[in-house]
Amino acid sequence: MLFRSNVVIDGPLSLDVALYKEAAEIKKVKGSSVAGDADCLLFPNIESGNVFFKASTHMGGGEIAAMVMGTKVPCVLTSRGDSSLTKLYSIALACLAAK
């Protein structure tokens, strides 16, 4: 587990509010220092996380690091179709979480 004293956690936030300050302003989200500036997104289950992961990488051309949380040890879960860079980022994330 990764424990830091300078982490700000907020939610639940809709995806647009988590990622875009303009959406937070339009929706009049108040009192959130994370809205529009999220560095990390958590999903309620592996299925919804996978949908976001696939959409981001395939339609957005992004590289993402993915890891399953809640296990005794870091668990990297990559897809056969993931790029080498996404696999490397996922391994690096798991190594950081293992410390």
Give, region by region, the residue ranges found by the protein language model:
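Glycine-rich phosphate/nucleotide-binding loop
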Residues: 10-99
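Short, small-residue-biased leader/transition segments that mark boundaries at the very start
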Residues: 1-2
